[in-house]
Amino acid sequence: MSFEEGADLNASHCCREWLAAVLGNTHVRWGWFVEETLVKVERFPAHQPLSWPQQTELWLAPVGSAPLPPASPWVHQLELSQVPLRDPYPGLGLDRALALWAAGIHYGWPCLVIDAGTALTLTGADSEGSLVGGAILPGLGLQAQALADHTALLPKVQWDPQDPLPPRWANDTVAAIRSGILHTLLAGLREFIADWRRRFPQGPLLLTGGDGKWLHPHLGPLDPELRWDPHLVLRGIAGCRQLHRTARHSPSAE
């Protein structure tokens, strides 16, 4: 599978068009940009063989086990040290840093990002753009997979963003698994959000990640500043690229 097949866009040698890629554990997300505008996003299974574009500027955020493309002068691999988030701790996930920094520069500081992917993470920064801290827990799919893998009789439950919230007191096994995972997850997130608001009464809250679309309508009534942005990490990559290009063309760099 190649990105061009899904995007129907041609590679450009003039650097107006370029590609960002987030290499995760379960998926690879490609974002095609024209200058700073995100025009197309595609998602592929992480270990599916991919045909990477040739002679196209490519910025990578390796955040999981997906294989890297071949090295070339066109490929730029980001590291945590290149994200201008203040006071990150060693080992902070690159995707968490990119999403938080993008949230801050696009929506304002202080901010809290809830990334509902394979792992669900909460990451916050204060009004100065300094990391406050966060939390990591298994995402919806990983919790369901753990029950199926480590019990003899429980089935694996699939999620659909269109599914309504199940009844809390379920009367069959599948509904009981859904209830247990979803209601306890929402209760925990509400408590984290309430604690964040005690510390930072103002500022945006951002949901991103594959399960964020499902979480948004269930958490949105809790806080009017909660927004859903599925492309925060890609926006963070774009911001880092812009900083790199600005620094390279500044008088001090000549």
Swiss-Prot record:
Q: In which pathway does it act?
A: Cofactor biosynthesis; coenzyme A biosynthesis; CoA from (R)-pantothenate: step 1/5
List the signal peptide residues. none
Q: What class of enzyme is it?
A: transferase
Q: How is the cofactor bound?
A: A monovalent cation. Ammonium or potassium.
Q: Name one Pfam family in it.
A: Pan_kinase
Cofactor requirements of the protein: NH4(+); K(+)
List the GO biological process terms: coenzyme A biosynthetic process
Entry's transmembrane regions: none
Matching entries from InterPro entries are given as: ATPase_NBD (IPR043129), Type_III_PanK (IPR004619)
Residues noted as binding K(+) in the record, renumbered to the chain: D115
User: According to its record, what are the GO cellular component terms?
Assistant: cytoplasm
Alphabetical keyword list: ATP-binding, Coenzyme A biosynthesis, Cytoplasm, Kinase, Metal-binding, Nucleotide-binding, Potassium, Transferase
Q: What is its EC number?
A: 2.7.1.33
Positions annotated as active site in the UniProt record: D95 (proton acceptor)
Reactions that this protein is recorded to catalyse: (R)-pantothenate + ATP = (R)-4'-phosphopantothenate + ADP + H(+)
Q: Where does substrate bind?
A: Y89, G93, L94, D95, R96, T173
Question: A single Gene Ontology molecular function, please?
Answer: ATP binding
Residue positions binding ATP: V22, L23, G24, N25, T26, H27, V28, R29, T118
Localization per Swiss-Prot or TrEMBL? Cytoplasm
Its main localization is: cytoplasm
Role this protein plays: Catalyzes the phosphorylation of pantothenate (Pan), the first step in CoA biosynthesis.
The record's family statement is: Belongs to the type III pantothenate kinase family.
Instruction: Describe the subunit structure.
Output: Homodimer.
What is the name listed in the Swiss-Prot or TrEMBL entry for this protein? Type III pantothenate kinase
